[in-house]
UniProtKB/Swiss-Prot annotation:
Associated pathway: Carbohydrate degradation; glycolysis; pyruvate from D-glyceraldehyde 3-phosphate: step 3/5
UniProt catalytic activity: (2R)-2-phosphoglycerate = (2R)-3-phosphoglycerate
GO process annotations (BP): gluconeogenesis; glycolytic process
Record keywords: Gluconeogenesis, Glycolysis, Isomerase
Record protein name field: 2,3-bisphosphoglycerate-dependent phosphoglycerate mutase
Subunit composition and interactions: Homodimer.
Length: 250
């Protein structure tokens, strides 16, 4: 029986990843390193024999440009793509733009770990008159007030990612199409938690590295039977550890 596969990839390193700043819905681009990571992910997928029928990404350019570079390496730049805000990074509220290590020095490592990785913990929220509030951004003009976040926990991120998975992405996977999703650390953590039924403590320790393809294999009932990264295991572990350490005081 043919195994159904799904590929997830977190965007390559962004300019604010490089500066160790909380990014959330702020629309920063890839760093030079991030472009290289995205191209390397595409080459790795090509070398492993992957090709796709459809792609999904967020409305943030670090994920969009990652997908562009991946598909370019696969010689599939023509692939149909759907962009949705529901795949955006978790909204980090008033933390957006702040340096993570400096924030940890001010509030403590454990508080920042909870803000970054806690399941139901929300960072301090933005006010609606703050220029960072997404209601001021034309790409979100059709969203209702209830849909526009002032801050988000991982639990709230799950509330938008999982219905999008079930209603939009999964039916395409079930139809036999080969799908790739280029998104963000926390929108992908939300999906992994749901697919693998991870507990709150397990998801607290899950860190997804930038620019590394994550492959899911599903059984005939579309239940996950295997999840694995493509690439060198030691390098991937080091990248995941670096993600975990971003929120610690220096």
């Amino acid at each position: 029986m043919a195994v159904t596969k799904l590929v997830l990839v977190r965007h390559g390193e962004s300019q604010w990843n490089n500066e160790n700043r909380f990014t959330g819905w702020y629309d920063v681009d890839l760093s030079e390193k991030g472009v290289g990571e995205a191209k390397a992910a595409g080459k790795l997928l090509k070398d492993e024999g992957f090709s796709f029928d459809f792609a999904y990404t967020s409305v943030l350019k670090r994920a969009i440009h990652t997908l562009w570079n991946v598909l370019d390496e696969l010689d599939q730049a023509w692939l149909p793509v759907e962009k949705s805000w529901k795949l955006n990074e978790r909204h980090y509220g008033a933390l957006q733009g702040l340096n993570k290590a400096e924030t940890a020095e001010k509030y403590g490592d454990e508080q920042v770990k909870q803000w970054r990785r806690g399941f139901a913990v929300t960072p301090p929220e933005l006010t609606k008159d703050d220029e960072r509030y997404p209601g001021h951004d034309p790409r979100y003009a059709k969203l209702t007030d209830a849909e526009l976040p002032q801050t988000e926990s991982l639990a709230l991120t799950i509330d938008r990612v999982v219905p999008y998975w079930n209603d939009t992405i999964l039916p395409r996977v079930k139809s036999g199409e080969r799908v790739i999703v280029a998104a963000h650390g926390n929108s992908l953590r939300a999906l992994v938690k749901y697919l693998d039924n991870l507990g709150e403590e397990e998801i607290l320790e899950l860190n997804i590295p930038t620019g590394v393809p994550l492959v899911y294999e599903f059984d005939e009932n579309f239940k996950p039977i295997k999840r694995y990264y493509l690439g060198n295991a030691d390098e991937i572990a080091a990248k995941a550890a670096a993600v975990a350490n971003q929120g610690k005081a220096k």
